[in-house]
UniProtKB/Swiss-Prot annotation:
Gene: ndk
Primary localization: cytoplasm
Species the sequence originates in: Yersinia pseudotuberculosis serotype O:1b (strain IP 31758)
Signal peptide span: none
PROSITE patterns for this protein: NDPK (PS00469), NDPK_LIKE (PS51374)
InterPro entries attached to this UniProt entry: NDK-like_dom, NDK-like_dom_sf, Nucleoside_diP_kinase, Nucleoside_diP_kinase_AS
Catalytic activity: a 2'-deoxyribonucleoside 5'-diphosphate + ATP = a 2'-deoxyribonucleoside 5'-triphosphate + ADP; a ribonucleoside 5'-diphosphate + ATP = a ribonucleoside 5'-triphosphate + ADP
UniProt entry keywords in alphabetical sequence: ATP-binding, Cytoplasm, Kinase, Magnesium, Metal-binding, Nucleotide metabolism, Nucleotide-binding, Phosphoprotein, Transferase
GO CC terms, sorted: cytoplasm
Active site: 117
Family: Belongs to the NDK family.
Subcellular location: Cytoplasm
Protein name: Nucleoside diphosphate kinase
Amino acid sequence: MALERTFSIIKPNAVANNNIGAIYARFESAGFNIIAAKMLHLTKEQAEGFYAEHKGRPFFDGLVEFMTSGPIMVQVLEGENAVQRHRDIMGATNPDNALAGTLRADFADSFTANAVHGSDAVESAQREIAYFFAADEIFPRS
């Protein structure tokens, strides 16, 4: 296994439902170090830029609207095999298909309001981390 970084978002519904602490506790219990974190409220332009790969898809406008509907938490997680392990604890994108005990099974409200986002590959993690964090905002602890 390799020490990796992955990017994570706690989405507006989970922030509004006061689930930040519970989700952070799950990250730390799973062996992740949270090496960068901040709360922000995305502008339409920021959301469209972040999700640019989905532009033109039927769900794009709804996703942008949801992601700009309230504050989010963005964080960088570091740990062994971080990208895949984070995806495993998030659960299936559709919370109806998420295994019990996963973040989406426990905190999602719907397919769009599915509580969390996580990078799908090391390369996308690097791109997503750089979208929200400068190098001097990341503090490795390992």
